Structures are given as C-alpha cells and as structure tokens.
Amino acid sequence: MTSTATFREDFHSLRAGGLNWDSLPLRLFGKGNAKFWDPADIDFTRDAEDWQGLTEEERRSVAMLCSQFIAGEEAVTQDLQPFMAAMAAEGRFGDEMYLTQFCFEEAKHTQVFRLWMDAVGLTGDLHSHVAENPGYRAIFYEELPRSLNALHDDPSPANQVRASVTYNHVVEGTLALTGYFAWQKICRSRGILPGMQEVVRRIGDDERRHMAWGTFTCRRHVAADESNWDVVQEQMQHLLPLAVTQIQWRPEDAPEETPFRLDIDELAAYASDRAGRRLGAISAARGVPVEQIDVDASPEQLEDQFGVEDAAALEKA
C-alpha cells in the first residue's frame, strides 16, 4: 500500500486581509473565550447536603438524568473530530478554530458532571441508566457516531447537514438543552443543588453557541443548494421519534408518579418551539447568497433570544 504525504501549502493567518473576524464561527470563538469558566471553581458542598435530603426515588431519577447528560457529553467529545477534518477539507479555518473550542467545551462539560457526581457520591457503575433506554441507545450508540464518522469518508454537504442535524439539532437542541432547562427549573423551584444550577446555566450558554454554529452550517449548505433543505427535514423526521422514545422511557419498576412532578407535555412544547424556530432559520437561507450567510448573525441572535426567554421563565420558577 502506497501512502501519499500531504504537505501544507500556505497559512490562512498569513493571507492578505488576515482572518475574517466578522464571520459567524470566529464571532462565536471570541464569545466563547470571553465566557471561559473552570469546572473546578464550582462549589458542590451544598449539593452533597441536598442530595442526602432527596428521597430514594428522586435520587434514582437524578442519577438517570445525570448519567444521560454526562454520557452524552463524552460521546459528542469523541464524535466531533470528523467535523473538524471536514472543515479542513473545505478550507474553512475559522470553523476549525471554533470547533476546537467547541470540542474543548464538551470535554469540560464531561468533567464538571463527573465532579458533581463524585461530590454527591454517585460513584458506582451507572451504565444501566443509558444502556437500557432504547431511544438513548439508538441515538448515542448508533446514530451519532454513524453520522459523524461518515464525514471521514465523505465530507459532502449532505453528510455535513446530516451530521449537524443529528449532533446540533437533535442531541444538543432537542435533548440536551431541553433537559438542562427542565432540570434547572426543578432545582430553582425547590431551592436545591445550587452548584448544579450553576453548572447547567454555564453549559446551556456554551450549548447555545454550539447550536448557533449548527444552524449556521445547515444554512450555509442550504443556501448553496436548496436540495439540502430536504436532507435537513428527512434527518429530523428520522431522528425525532427516537428522541421521543428516549424522553418517554422509564424503568419497569418506576413509580406511577414522576419524581419532581416533571411536566412532560410542557417539555415537549418547549422542545417543539425551539426546534421549529431553528428550522425556520435554516429554511430562510434558501435563495440567500452564500457569501451573505457567512457574516449573517441571525443564528447567534436567535440563540441569544432563547437565553433571554429561558432566564425569564426561570425567574418565575
């Protein structure tokens, strides 16, 4: 087998005009740098005390929720790397810069959940909380790695759209951000777990930047070729039933009344509203000049608006 070495021809940072700091990926990169936070700075002492005050069923519910969160963060940390290679193949160095930060933040989210779990004593094997959930298995064990790893062999626009819909719009937008919002609302309404409240607030802020990049990437490809809008819709239609299965699944021995009295209908409405508005932003890119998409701040502004709306809702919790 003969291997052909690939040599570097030039440097993006040395080209005339330098880097385009007005492009959305580099704006997100700058915003992420300005909002840096360290998981080790968060105090979980009160959380460990509050944990002891939860009922056995409440602790099991929290353990399941956190297991799904941390395993998801670990999975996306591992699976994101093919997208970086796809951006390199396109010559999009600004996207590469942002995705390095993106991946670092996912690893940091894994760290902070593990620190919290260690602090409250969740140190046993927790695989049953994810492995027995058929929706979770389908998305995180199969669909996520499949869609991202497809970029290794074929980083085509259609495959990038499928990967972004899977990663950004289903895993992050439909599952993670909805779950984080619900969990923070529960903690605030009961006045418990202040460390976890800070964790979720900071992670949510990071994830909204990730979502902005995912929406931007889909918009870029839809603007270049309207047939990619069909790819967006097909992938969403394929994955959403799996997401619903994950959310609705409960262990066979779970009590009839959901711990914390979580309103599933309210969560479904929240997720549907956010997904619909993000998909609307992608659809709106049809017919827009591609060069205009690169500096269009609308995906970033949409996520900022979601942050404002979440903060207002949590104030009422």
Swiss-Prot record:
Binding site for Mn(2+): E73, E106, H109
Cofactor mode of binding and number, as noted: Binds 1 Fe cation per subunit. Binds 1 manganese ion per subunit. The iron and manganese ions form a dinuclear manganese-iron cluster.
CDD domains: RNRR2_Rv0233_like
Keyword GTP-binding: no
InterPro entries (alphabetical): Ferritin-like_SF, R2LOX, RNR-like, RNR_small_fam
Positions annotated to bind Fe cation: E106, E172, E207, H210
GO biological process: deoxyribonucleotide biosynthetic process
Pfam family, one: Ribonuc_red_sm
Gene3D superfamilies named in the record: Ribonucleotide Reductase, subunit A
Stated name of the protein: R2-like ligand binding oxidase
Organism: Saccharopolyspora erythraea (strain ATCC 11635 / DSM 40517 / JCM 4748 / NBRC 13426 / NCIMB 8594 / NRRL 2338)
